[in-house]
């Protein structure tokens, strides 16, 4: 009887080990998903810049090309105000746990502060042969082209604890 019990338990034990799945889909929080997707987006931006440079183009050229592509996705009828609202949304989303602060606003201007974008790159140096300064050059030019298309101007000022963006109606 003990033998039968021992054999049964052994078979159940071995079966449970063999039946375990090698891969499982783990639960991921929305915060983790968001952070991962921002990382993926930044990686794609860096890879785009790196590829453009490897093909003899400058960061400025690839930023202009990208801005020209992206600008037509914005509703031109929403003008500078649509751009300002879009910037608020995009900057709130593009940096995990970002808390935007509106510093000033009027009928023709919006000034807000954001956390530093892609702080890992800033603190750890080049990735995919792209520096933080090149990354920021790309973002600034890209934004300026879209702003112009929508009748706005945008400026960036890096400060100790983030970046200040000023959007003005032209």
What are these regions (language model features)?
Residues 20-138, 148, 153-170:
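N-terminal accessory segment detector
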Residues 15-19:
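Sec/Tat signal peptide C-region and signal peptidase I cleavage site
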């Amino acid at each position: 009887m003990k033998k039968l019990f021992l054999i049964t338990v052994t078979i159940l034990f071995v079966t449970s080990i063999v039946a375990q799945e090698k891969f499982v889909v783990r639960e991921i929080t929305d915060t983790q998903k968001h952070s991962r997707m921002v990382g993926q987006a930044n990686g794609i931006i860096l890879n785009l810049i790196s590829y453009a440079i490897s093909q003899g183009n400058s960061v400025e050229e690839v930023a202009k090309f990208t801005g020209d592509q992206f600008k037509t996705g914005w509703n031109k009828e929403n003008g500078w105000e649509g751009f300002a609202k879009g910037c608020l949304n995009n900057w709130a989303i593009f940096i995990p746990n970002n808390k935007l602060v509106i510093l000033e606003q009027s009928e023709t201007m919006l000034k807000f502060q954001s956390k530093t974008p892609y702080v890992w790159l800033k603190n750890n140096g080049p990735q995919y042969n792209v520096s933080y300064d090149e990354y920021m050059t790309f973002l600034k030019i890209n934004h300026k082209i879209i702003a112009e298309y929508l009748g706005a101007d945008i400026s960036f000022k890096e400060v100790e604890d983030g970046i200040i963006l000023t959007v003005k109606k032209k």
